[in-house]
């Protein structure tokens, strides 16, 4: 009788473990999906912010360019045109980010770094392990207990 009882307990235990593994897998998949959704939303917000900024900065850039060009022509001083150069870099960068291919170029560069330059991505003392965390926790608790 004990054998039959233990056999059914083993089956129940096995079923429970399978359920837990399946549940953990589902939880992990949901978590990864949620993280990806959050990343996509953050990227969309960044692009939207860049486009919105471009509207205001583009207006400022246009007015500044016209004003500086007019001042340079009226006063016959080409030095008035100098501020247009850095403003044009900012305008071009924001346009490229909002409507151009900057994000695709950054993505391909990041993928290239991940594939070919792995050593630059390593942590200084390697991956954090449970043992290293426990060691640091013990050392920290010793400091507090000594005081």
UniProtKB/Swiss-Prot annotation:
Expressed in monocytes; detected in differentiated monocytes but not in progenitor cells. Expressed in adrenal medulla and hippocampus. Its main location: membrane. It is a multi-pass membrane protein. InterPro entries: Plg-R(KT). Keywords: Cell membrane, Chemotaxis, Inflammatory response, Membrane, Plasminogen activation, Transmembrane, Transmembrane helix. Residues 1-52, 100-147 are extracellular. This is Plasminogen receptor (KT). It comes from Mus musculus (Mouse). The gene is Plgrkt.
């Amino acid at each position: 009788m004990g054998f039959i009882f233990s056999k059914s307990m083993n089956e129940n235990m096995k079923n429970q473990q399978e359920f837990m593994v399946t549940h953990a897998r589902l939880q992990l998949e949901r978590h990864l999906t949620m993280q990806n959704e959050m990343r996509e939303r953050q990227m969309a917000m960044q692009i939207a912010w860049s486009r919105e900024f471009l509207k205001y900065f583009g207006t400022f850039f246009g007015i500044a360019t016209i004003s500086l060009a007019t001042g340079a022509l009226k006063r016959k001083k080409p030095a008035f045109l100098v501020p247009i150069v850095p403003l044009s870099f900012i305008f071009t960068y924001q346009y490229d980010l909002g409507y151009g291919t900057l994000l695709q170029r950054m993505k391909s560069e990041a993928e290239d770094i991940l594939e070919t330059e792995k050593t630059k991505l390593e942590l200084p003392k390697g991956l954090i392990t449970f043992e290293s965390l426990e060691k640091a926790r013990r050392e920290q608790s010793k400091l507090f207990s000594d005081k």
